[in-house]
Amino acid sequence: MSFVLAIDQGTTSSRAIVFRSDISIAAVAQQEFPQHFPASGWVEHEPEDIWTSTVMTCRDALDKAGIKAKDIAAIGITNQRETTVVWDRATGQAVHRAIVWQDRRTADICAKLKADGYEPDVSAKTGLIIDPYFSGTKVAWILDHVPGARERAERGELLFGTVDCYLLWRLTGGRVHATDATNASRTLLFNIHTGQWDDTLLKLLRVPRSMLPEVKDSSAEFGTTTPDLFGGPIKVSGIAGDQQAATIGQACFTPGMMKSTYGTGCFALLNTGATPVKSNNKLLTTIAYQLGGVRTYALEGSIFVAGSAVQWLRDGLGIIKHAAETGPLADKSDSMQSVYLVPAFVGLGAPYWNPRVRGALFGLTRNTGPAELAHATLESVCYQTYDLWAAMRADWPDASAATIVLRVDGGMTASDWTMQRLADLLDAPVDRPMIQETTALGAAYLAGLNAGVYPEPEKFADNWRLEHRFKPAMSAATRQRKLAGWARAVKGVLASDEGE
């Protein structure tokens, strides 16, 4: 039997999952690593922590599965997107900590670019908006703030990569500097229509072309690992950013299929097929995957705070000890209270895109307690998803509640309470799959497709299995009342921004 090893390098932990040829899971390993918050709105990782935790989990997963490197047909990599690493081409030493996708330090840079009128052209080429979320301004910040970095970059001494690219470079012993189209499409430097790095964008952000990796299909020959890492060489043949990998793992290969992943943040992608759809509602146009040189596009909405809001309940407020307690606690809340949490801890993502605002609670009374806060926290994720859902339906002419199929994954989907409330607020069914490791499965599929372990997308889609369908059960009047309250809460938060 052939096995495929998936590396799932996330925001708070690195994971490795061994899949069998029938897509069942043979072993899982996970290791958390430290987060660094050197200033308000700043989030960093040590690249060496990312690398070490990745290698350790891969070795652990192989041991748990009882297999050797020779049993692995291929490795697939999926990663936290946009997180930016710049390192020395000769030594592999990072010149600065990785700047994480959540980091907002470049808000002023982005504001100036917008004020100077660059956003329409940038958006037309990249499908993105000018925002600190994306890699381009993070690279520029590193080059401008690390002594000597810009000069070294101009001399061709430094390399840039998203996390997949950095891991691939390390896995191959510095022999391969490459990424895939999905990760490239998140940098603010890549033209999603031509499939090339864009010289105008590079000039705008003053990023030398020599720093950039080669861009390949999501399923391709990316090189082989050095034999010393895992006891023998293993080829790497699949790469995709985490949200695109989840889209593939959910078998959303048909236009109109939508997946929503609930981890630290929440990310929804709607497959729009071979044609990029320009959003009129501040959604992103991105590459869902690229196979055989053919790009498939998606509309994407990004929510910065989802699971991390539950972490706030646990670590910040101390009202729960474990995330699993949140749903049962929320179920005990006072139905007469209408408490809303707008979790803009690092600003608001789609469809508002405001990095300056911060979170707020609305509707507090003397009787508001832990149950109401838990209720508001879980509901905030559902409300934010509704905002994305509504924007996608408005942007895509073929969309309707009847035509969009929503498949969910990620840690928060284990909460039946949250998924039922999501179906209620969307007034649409929500499908939870049997295999929850959809992000890793997507990476494994891309690698296994190239290695001949897995079939073409249409046949792979036949293996998708439903675990539970949540059907809407809320009255229209209640739904509208709740959504109106959420809209007022968001309006209140946006009004607090001095820049508005």
Curated annotation (Swiss-Prot):
A GO CC term attached to the entry: cytosol
UniProt keyword annotations, A-Z: ATP-binding, Glycerol metabolism, Kinase, Nucleotide-binding, Transferase
Enzyme's top EC category: transferase
Sequence positions that bind glycerol: R81, E82, Y133, D242, Q243
Taxonomy, superkingdom: Bacteria
Molecular function (Gene Ontology), one example: glycerol kinase activity
E.C. code: 2.7.1.30
Residues given in the record as ADP binding sites: T11, R15, T264, G307, G411
Residues annotated as binding sn-glycerol 3-phosphate: T11, R81, E82, Y133, D242
Summary of the function given for this chain in its UniProt record: Key enzyme in the regulation of glycerol uptake and metabolism. Catalyzes the phosphorylation of glycerol to yield sn-glycerol 3-phosphate.
NCBIfam families attached to this UniProt entry: glycerol_kin, PRK00047.1
Family the entry assigns: Belongs to the FGGY kinase family.
Protein name (Swiss-Prot/TrEMBL): Glycerol kinase
Gene (name only): glpK
